[in-house]
Amino acid sequence: MASVAIKEPKTAITPKKKSKASRLCFTPPTNLHNNKKNIFYTRYDCIGEGGFARCFRVKDNYGNIYAAKVIAKRSLQNDKTKLKLFGEIKVHQSMSHPNIVGFIDCFEDSTNIYLILELCEHKSLMELLRKRKQLTEPEVRYLMMQILGALKYMHKKRVIHRDLKLGNIMLDESNNVKIGDFGLAALLMDDEERKMTICGTPNYIAPEILFNSKEGHSFEVDLWSAGVVMYALLIGKPPFQDKEVKTIYRKIKANSYSFPSNVDISAEAKDLISSLLTHDPSIRPSIDDIVDHEFFHTGYMASTLPDEILHSMPIWPSSQSKSSFQRNLDFVASASGVGFGNSAGVEKNKPYALRTDEVDNDRILPSVLSPRDRVNPVMKIGPETKPVPSKLSTALHAARKSTDGSLGSRVKVLREESQSFVPTKSAVTEQVEPIQLIRSLSANTVSRLSKVGNMKSDIWISVKKTALKIGMALEAHTHALTSEDADSEPVLFITKWVDYSNKYGLGYQLSDESVGVHFNDDTSLLFSADEEVVEYALHPKDTEIKPYIYPASKVPESIRSKLQLLKHFKSYMGQNLSKAVQDESFEKPKNSTSNTMLFMQHYLRTRQAIMFRLSNGIFQFNFLDHRKVVISSTARKIIVLDKERERVELPLQEASAFSEDLRSRLKYIRETLESWASKMEVS
């Protein structure tokens, strides 16, 4: 049943028959072009049709497959419908959560408006339920956890979806929930604001929308709809379903529904549904309280859903250990950002106030609806994107490919093209001296190392030398950097990471495809790219780190639970996260001193970035605007990864010729390292 905006409940009872707005949308051309970004899309088959749009499979000129939601301009007859579309676009653009359909692009031609969205290969829960008739409780437990995580994220951003239903809840290729269609979404100015519009899909509308329009409604309407969804998944149809809309509303008003005796449903599931389908919105449970309900803590808890669910009822194990249940529950809850203390998603730009400027000619979309920079979320599910190179990456390539080789030409290109980055006020204001600083560092090492302890000494030297070399490079003291051989070995860096430090630790993947977890108990577990070798490392405070290497098939019992958790991290990152760089072949660095793998030894969050330090002294700074700077272990070379995931290597000795943006980032890195070294001396 289509979503409708309803002035009065009775208007939905006897709607006038008229052509769907989507019928006004003819099949668009085979080749589509976003003129602003100069991105081309090839249009393929129609994969869906709703009340107001048609959906087509498209492929961009980088080979990425998306879904294009196509709205005919002829269907936008008045300012009200145009503003409604603008609102949908701006709200959806502001969303960045692993369980919300990704918004990729937006553009128009003379006939249509195109919304390029993340493709959900396994379609909607409506289509799944048509095939399956009913789902099992473990499936519903998993899906509801992700639905609630997406709702928690929306509500935190003061967005009410208002049209949560089976048809708007999609599944990606890994059977993860993706909530879409923000056509009826409302953005609140503050948490106390109430919305008055009567809107929604009859089977899912909360009673306060229909019958308390004077008092208005708020976030709780989405929880009512979530209860309807949960009931439908377990029973096979919505609780108030009827052929007549008038009867549906009568049942909603009376809260008249029941649980069929021929359906096996647990008491916990019934209780949770009943609490969500409470007429008084003020006593519906909060989202985190819902996840704390007994329904989510009994039965079987899956960490993923197999493709088997798409066509048949899965057979779940008859029993599950408490540790396995809790681990899977924590994993799914943390990934979706639901549960007390958890959050997921990226705080993107808040929705802009809608523009009501007059529109010239055939143009409908304001320019602000086509963002020039698409910010990739830290946690992202779906195909990896390869957008048009950013200004930063273009400038860096121009600098590296400069034909005359002069520093002046490179300075001009980099400075003119890069965007500015403003670091926090410097805590280190002294001028950096030339080569004597590194020599004096060595001379003073003995007296100062007594302050930092045995284990910290090598780290302290690494941090101080890196900070000093960056400072000298920025001040054009390049002669101080030529006394050592340039880096000849490839530089590894972190391509993916996910933070579960509230429960376990921080997981990451390196550019050689090895995977590791830095656990909260100061241990690290590493898994080689070929999954044949496991390395376990302790991080003692005052002695040298001692790694233990095992064949993957002979891991001791004492660390098997950590290995299982690492595999969960690996699986999650493989399915859900984009790499920091486009796919390339990376040569594995040779280790002259041992056969051990590199691992992340330290990480530090600051206001501007998160810093990682690898065990061989490589530093990596991931800035909040998704640009990354990697500094080699000898501080001879840096790698710049821009937010479009392009990778450029530059010699640090040319820092004086870098763009103001990159120089500012290096200054910030230097200051952070200096501050860290100082703290090591006094800790």
From Swiss-Prot:
SMART domains: S_TKc
Residue ranges constituting the Protein kinase domain according to the UniProt record: 41-296
Catalytic residues (positions): D163
Location of this chain's protein in the cell: Chromosome, Centromere, Kinetochore; Cytoplasm, Cytoskeleton, Microtubule organizing center, Spindle pole body
Catalytic reaction(s) noted: L-seryl-[protein] + ATP = O-phospho-L-seryl-[protein] + ADP + H(+); L-threonyl-[protein] + ATP = O-phospho-L-threonyl-[protein] + ADP + H(+)
Entry binding sites for ATP: I47, G48, E49, G50, G51, F52, A53, R54, C55, K69
Entries under InterPro entries matching the protein: Kinase-like_dom_sf, POLO_box_1, POLO_box_2, POLO_box_dom, POLO_box_dom_sf, Prot_kinase_dom, Protein_kinase_ATP_BS, Ser/Thr_kinase_AS
Residue ranges, annotated region (Interaction with cut12): 322-683
Residue span of region Localization to the spindle poly body: 317-683
Protein known as: Serine/threonine-protein kinase plo1
Organism from which the protein derives: Schizosaccharomyces pombe (strain 972 / ATCC 24843) (Fission yeast)
Gene name of the record: plo1
